[in-house]
Amino acid sequence: FQPYFTATASNIGYGWWSHDIGGHMCGYRNEHLEARWYQLGTFSPINRLHSSSSPFTGKEPWNFSGDVHAAMVASLRLRHMLLPYLYTMNYRAALDGRPLVEPMYWSEPNNPQAYEVPDEFRFGTELLVAPIVTDDDPTAQRGRTEAWLPQGEWYDFFDGRRYVSDNASGRRLEVWRALDRTPVFAKAGGIIPLQELATGDDVNDLRNP
């Protein structure tokens, strides 16, 4: 329900929404879902890990190993790379009152398909995000979700794969992704400013926001 809450909070003017990434108390531990939650946090208004002194509730990436740790670190680094885009979209939010995250039906209120993907949302003006919120299929070793692409051309944010949605009602997709990827689509012609990851002496430099 976290992607749904994150998107629909905008309906009541609550654009600065966050969640306890990885959960907080109770529940059960699932490392792959922890990594998927990191990915949702990367494409949320506020990216906030929740933790405590207990190893069970500690959500920091150094509490994990292997492919889960790698996926978590990649998500945090991507969030840092997205800072110029986030700054631009938050300036837009302050100027125009448009939140960073919007349900799909905001831009196409008369399209019934826009209401059929409650976990999918627009992230700023250029990106669509369809988070994976279930465990990976044990056979395929991939996570699965359904996505809807409005009419037009779209590109996978990570590998540049092209998707064409040539119907006015849009295109529904069954999307499978490895643990280190989450379904994010950029519209054709979109501009997504990113910054390079700082290394060496530049990590704490004033030039590195």
Language model region names:
Residues 1-188, 195, 199-203:
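Catalytic-domain carbohydrate-binding cleft regions of carbohydrate-active enzymes
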